[in-house]
């Protein structure tokens, strides 16, 4: 596979999600990423395939609603975040502990 990495691919993928649930999902060839709020599934798939040189089987997305917090007596809210659950083809793996 050719690696035609473009700067926009780095704008789509914000960071890998390293949680207990994400670690359990990695046993089933799934990797979780925090992605840009306006990123679409085809953009996420293309970015993952180019950046990590793997084949993506499917992409599922979800939006986590921001929490309401009190800071110095003022009510505020955290931003919503978008996550992508990327299912990889058999034989392909991504080690999220290494850098891009």
Curated annotation (Swiss-Prot):
Q: Which UniProt keywords apply?
A: Ribonucleoprotein, Ribosomal protein, RNA-binding, rRNA-binding
Cysteine disulfide partners in this protein: none
Gene name per UniProt: rplW
Q: How does it assemble?
A: Part of the 50S ribosomal subunit. Contacts protein L29, and trigger factor when it is bound to the ribosome.
Enumerate the PROSITE patterns for this protein. RIBOSOMAL_L23
**How is this protein named in the record?**
Large ribosomal subunit protein uL23
Give the protein's biological function: One of the early assembly proteins it binds 23S rRNA. One of the proteins that surrounds the polypeptide exit tunnel on the outside of the ribosome. Forms the main docking site for trigger factor binding to the ribosome.
- What is the species listed in this Swiss-Prot or TrEMBL entry? Bradyrhizobium diazoefficiens (strain JCM 10833 / BCRC 13528 / IAM 13628 / NBRC 14792 / USDA 110)
Pfam families listed in its UniProt record: Ribosomal_L23
Q: Name one GO molecular function term.
A: structural constituent of ribosome
Q: Which GO terms describe its cellular component?
A: cytosolic large ribosomal subunit
**Protein family per UniProt:** Belongs to the universal ribosomal protein uL23 family.
Source organism lineage? Bacteria, Pseudomonadati, Pseudomonadota, Alphaproteobacteria, Hyphomicrobiales
One GO process term, biological-process aspect: translation
